[in-house]
Structures are given as structure tokens and as C-alpha cells.
A protein has these predicted regions:
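N-terminal Lys/Arg-rich, disordered targeting/topogenic segments
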Residues: 1-24
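Terminal, non-catalytic domain-edge segments
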Residues: 439, 445-452, 500, 513, ...
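N-terminal carbohydrate-binding/catalytic regions of secreted carbohydrate-active enzymes
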Residues: 232-319, 460, 490, 497-500, ...
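Extended ligand-binding clefts on enzyme/binding-domain cores
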Residues: 229-238, 258-266, 312-317, 335-491, ...
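Short active-site neighborhood of thiol/selenol oxidoreductases, capturing the structured segment around
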Residues: 102-126
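Thiol/disulfide oxidoreductase modules built on the thioredoxin-like
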Residues: 168-171, 179-221
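Structural microenvironment flanking redox-active thiols in thiol-disulfide oxidoreductases
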Residues: 126-168, 179-185
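N-terminal "domain-start" segment that seeds a small globular fold
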Residues: 26-27, 60-104
Length: 561
């Protein structure tokens, strides 16, 4: 009996020990799961604004009152502001609760104003105040006034608390208050600190979210008062130029030709267009000099040239772009050499880049008789072809052929983009995946010619609104796996198309998406570039945004001719 009891007792104890071991294992598993969850949260935080150096960055802080439903860096920017537009009316108060119109305040100051929204309880705002001396000095350098606007949420903030914080940091800049966050809400602010720069007329010129370094503060003011394209042009001329008017293809010098130090005809044409938008004849002439001296052969432009090797063919799209630039320069500055070179190139293009069917082809040999039997649809620039056909009847069949190829090149109602290319020999359109930059270039050409179908524009506008455009698509409209990444050039082209379509809201949103990889820090050697940290900067990713930014900053419209 005693032995039976001992057996049962030992069995019970063993069972209890087993349960203890199970409980221990469960506790360890739960702890590991919690650690993994924390790790994922911290990793996700790096993807929020502040996790990259290419956009104005703030360390994510729950005290900043962010809406966690927002998903992309652009969603933290002011939602109701637009570059080159007036902000919603803003009435603030001083310490004595006297109402002050911001527009009247700016008029009285007779200068631009750098508005920084903040609050005394915000840790990120405290970090911003650590560079307050630099901020005040930069504002003076750019001829602006720094204005601190306290986010006066009655539940969390008070005038007294704000005054103490200002005294603590020895701030000398003026401070106004936003009772009940009326202006904060009207402007669509998403977090503090956030900066908005207005010119002396009260027009929005730049904005940024989060805690900015001194270098980013300088970059913000540079954008506001020197133009959105100023730093980008400086980066191109300083880091991508060969010193003789050629724009190198990349900051990476290695690889098969064309390498980073080689110059593409694509880049030269885009730089000529930019010079026309900015009415900069000196830049135009410098760019043209290299193009003419080093790239022109038998009336056509080599698609690339380098120190060791040059392309043996042209790229018809680039020749058309350069012809348009030359015609635009002749009209703007009235100098005969521009028109003379344009005529020479037009003659060569007609003689060597048009097939027996009257169709424009992708390329022709510079020294031989060979030519392509295909045409990329993004090469069919109707604006240029129409202008040339009006002056030379021999080009009328080329225009008609281009219109027919484009008309037949639409993929489907459900996916209203255009096939990548057309083969004249097989009379068939390419079924290869679409490079989205090329696909949008086709849409840009059509929009400039007032020929973009409404459903194609709606397709693009929906994606601008959603903030997602893949870098490559199958012809069935699905995104190619592995190409769902952010492309600066794609967003720049989306902005240019929105501009042509007269959709200011879509233009602003596309600019914001485009700016995701913009290097704002004026103390960074890549300042003004669109590039990820540690990655090369490519010319196309700089030049397309350069055009969009120039237009956003008031540049002269140039649609080609």
C-alpha cells in the first residue's frame, strides 16, 4: 500500500515537473515572439520618414502625433500645400492672444518667411532646437525670417510652456501661436517639427517634415529661394559633367560601354531642353558645342561617345529631341547656326532613318547604310514630326506612319498603355515587358501632342494618387516581380505628364514621390542629386527631375516644336 502511494506520489511529481518544463518552453517561445515583434517594429520604423537621408528626415516619435495609418514618406508632408501656390489663409496669435494674419506679417517684414511648426512637449522639436543658431543664421543669409509657430493644443501645450522652452534654448526668432491647431489642420500638417518656406509674396516655395540637420535646413532654403532645380543643376555640372559640355551617364565609372564617363545623346538632348526652359543660352551653347564637335557625324548624333569607344549608330528619338531644341533656340535667340544645324540633321534623319515603308526606325549606322527594322514607340514624337511635316512634304508619310503605329500600339482597354516596339518586317508589336520609363515617355510624347487618350491618363493618375508605379510591367498589366521599386525618373515623367494634362494636384503629388530620393543635405557631396546612399547617380534620373523642377519653379514652358 505504502509502495503504491509512493509510486503515485513519484508519478505526480514527475507529471508536475513535466508541466513545468512545458510551461517554461511556452514562456521562452512567447518571449522570443515578443522580441521578434519588437525587432520588426524597429525595422519598420527605419522605413518611415527619417530612415533615409534622401528625404527630409525625422526620427519617428509617437510624441509627434503621427497617424500610423499613413504609409509612405510623402504622407508625412503637408497635404494641403502646393509649390508655387498660396497656402490656406493663416491667422495666428501672439502671447497676448492678439490675432495676426500671416500674410500681413510677411508683407510687413518684406521678406520670405521660414515657418517651423513645433511644440514644447515634442522631443523631435527639442532636437531641432539644437541647431537653432544655425537656423537663424541661414535665414538671414537667404534674406528670410525664421518664424516659430507653436502648435497650441490646449490639452498638451500652453503659452507658458512654450515660453520656457524658448528661453531654455535662447531662441531669438519670433514666435506666434496656433490656438487649437487651426492653421496646422488647414495646411494639412502631419507632424512636428515641420517646415514651410514662403516667399515675400506669401507663396509656398518649399516644405519638409521632421527634424532637419543644419545641412538639410540649408538645402531647404536653397530650394525655396534659388529654385527647386538649382542644386540639381549644380550637382550635374559638378559631378556628371566632363568639363566640356558633355553630361556623363553616371557617377560610376566602371562597366561595359557606355560606362559612367561616357556621354549619351539622350542626356545632351535633355540638357538642351532644360537650357531652353531656363532661357540659359550659355548653358545651351556649351552643351551644343560638345554635341556638335564630339558626337555629330554625317548629320546624325552618335548615341554615345567615350574616351575609348563611341556608338556606331544614332538613336532617332535623341536626334528628334535635339532638332526640336535647335529649332526652339533659333526662335528664342534668333541665331542662324541653330537653324542651320537643325536643317542638316533633319535632312540626314529623313535620308537614313526612314525605311522604304515611310516609317521612322530606331537607328541608322553613322558610317554605313544599315538601319533598324524596328521602332520603339517612345521614339515617335508627334510634336516634332508634325512641325517637320508642315515645312517639308517629304516628311508627311513619316508622320502618317507614326500615327498609325501609335494607334495600333495601344495594348488593351484594361491596360491602356502602349507596346514597347513595332517590327516593320513582321508587322507585329513587341510582346516584351514594358520598361515603365519608356512607357511613360510614350505617354509624355502623346500628351505634348494633345493626343493622350483619356483612359491612359486616368490609369496613370490613379497610380499617382496611390503612390505606386512599378518599374516594369507585363503586357497583361501586371507588375513584373522584383520591379516594384521606386524609380525617380518614372515619377519625374509622371509629373511632366500631369503638367501637360493641366492637373495641378497630380503634378504636386508626382513631384513629392519623385523627391523621395532627393539629397537635401547641403553638406553632402551628393546635394541636389537623386540617389540612394552608396549608390551611383545616373544622368537620366537627374535630368528628368531637372525638367520637372524647373517647370515647378516657374521655368518657361517648352513642349518641343
Amino acid at each position: 500500500m505504502a509502495a503504491g502511494k509512493n509510486f503515485l506520489k513519484n508519478k505526480a511529481e514527475a507529471s508536475e515537473k513535466k508541466r513545468d518544463r512545458v510551461r517554461y518552453i511556452l514562456y521562452v517561445c512567447i518571449a522570443l515572439l515578443l522580441l521578434a515583434a519588437v525587432g520588426l517594429i524597429l525595422y519598420a520604423a527605419r522605413l518611415l520618414p527619417g530612415g533615409t537621408d534622401a528625404v527630409p528626415a525625422a526620427t519617428p516619435s509617437p510624441t509627434a502625433g503621427r497617424n500610423q495609418a499613413l504609409a509612405t514618406p510623402e504622407d508625412w508632408l503637408p497635404q494641403n500645400l502646393a509649390i508655387a501656390k498660396f497656402p490656406p489663409e493663416a491667422v495666428l496669435t501672439d502671447e497676448r492672444e492678439n490675432r495676426i494674419s500671416l500674410r500681413d506679417w510677411i508683407a510687413q517684414e518684406e521678406s520670405g518667411v521660414w515657418v517651423v511648426f513645433w511644440a514644447s512637449w515634442c522631443p523631435d522639436c527639442n532636437r531641432q532646437f539644437e541647431v537653432i543658431r544655425e537656423m537663424e543664421a541661414l535665414a538671414e543669409t537667404y534674406g528670410a525670417r525664421l518664424l516659430l509657430v507653436d502648435r497650441l493644443n490646449r490639452e498638451k501645450e500652453s503659452v507658458e510652456a512654450a515660453r520656457k522652452k524658448i528661453a531654455e534654448y535662447g531662441v531669438t526668432a519670433p514666435v506666434l501661436y496656433d490656438p487649437d491647431e487651426v492653421v496646422y489642420s488647414a495646411w494639412g500638417m502631419r507632424e512636428i517639427p515641420s517646415s514651410v518656406v514662403l516667399d515675400k509674396d506669401g507663396v509656398v516655395r518649399a516644405y519638409a517634415n521632421g527634424t532637419l540637420t543644419a545641412g538639410q535646413c540649408e538645402g531647404l532654403l536653397d530650394r525655396a529661394f534659388r529654385g527647386r532645380d538649382s542644386a540639381g543643376l549644380a550637382f550635374i555640372l559638378g559631378s556628371l559633367s566632363n568639363g566640356r559640355g558633355g553630361v556623363c551617364s553616371s557617377t560610376a565609372a566602371e562597366g561595359d560601354p557606355p560606362t559612367g564617363t561616357d556621354v549619351l545623346s539622350e542626356s545632351q538632348g535633355l540638357m538642351l531642353w532644360y537650357a531652353l526652359i531656363r532661357e540659359d543660352q550659355a548653358l545651351f551653347d556649351q552643351t551644343l558645342a560638345f554635341t556638335r564637335t564630339d558626337m555629330l557625324k554625317n548629320g546624325l548624333i552618335a548615341w554615345y561617345v567615350g574616351e575609348q569607344k563611341a556608338g556606331a549608330v544614332n538613336a532617332s528619338l535623341d536626334d528628334l529631341r535635339i532638332i526640336q531644341a535647335l529649332r526652339g533656340a533659333a526662335e528664342k535667340w534668333g541665331e542662324a547656326p541653330y537653324a542651320s544645324l537643325a536643317a542638316e540633321m533633319e535632312k540626314a534623319l529623313l535620308a537614313r532613318c526612314v525605311n522604304t515603308q515611310g516609317g521612322l526606325v530606331d537607328w541608322a549606322e553613322l558610317d554605313g547604310e544599315g538601319q533598324a527594322h524596328t521602332i520603339s514607340l517612345c521614339y515617335l514624337d508627334l510634336v516634332c514630326l508634325r512641325a517637320l511635316a508642315q515645312e517639308d512634304a517629304a516628311l508627311a508619310p513619316v508622320l502618317e506612319n507614326a500615327e498609325q503605329v501609335l494607334q495600333g500600339g495601344r495594348i488593351a482597354d484594361a491596360f491602356p498603355l502602349y507596346y514597347a516596339g513595332y517590327d516593320y518586317e513582321t508587322a507585329a508589336y513587341s510582346q516584351t515587358d514594358l520598361n515603365t520609363a519608356e512607357a511613360l515617355y510614350t505617354l509624355w510624347n502623346l500628351s505634348r501632342a494633345d493626343a493622350l487618350p483619356e483612359d491612359a491618363w486616368l490609369w496613370l493618375r490613379e497610380r499617382i494618387e496611390a503612390g505606386t508605379i512599378s518599374a516594369r510591367y507585363h503586357v497583361d498589366g501586371t507588375a513584373v516581380k522584383g520591379f516594384e521599386y521606386h524609380s525617380t525618373a518614372v515619377w519625374g515623367l509622371a509629373a511632366l505628364i500631369a503638367r501637360e494634362m493641366g492637373d495641378e494636384a497630380a503634378f504636386e503629388k508626382a513631384l513629392r514621390r519623385m523627391d523621395r530620393m532627393y539629397v537635401l543635405d547641403a553638406q553632402d557631396v551628393r546635394f541636389g542629386a537623386y540617389a540612394q546612399k552608396g549608390a551611383a547617380a545616373h544622368a537620366f534620373d537627374q535630368l528628368i527631375p531637372l525638367l520637372a523642377n524647373a517647370l515647378a519653379s516657374g521655368g518657361n514652358e517648352f513642349r518641343g516644336m
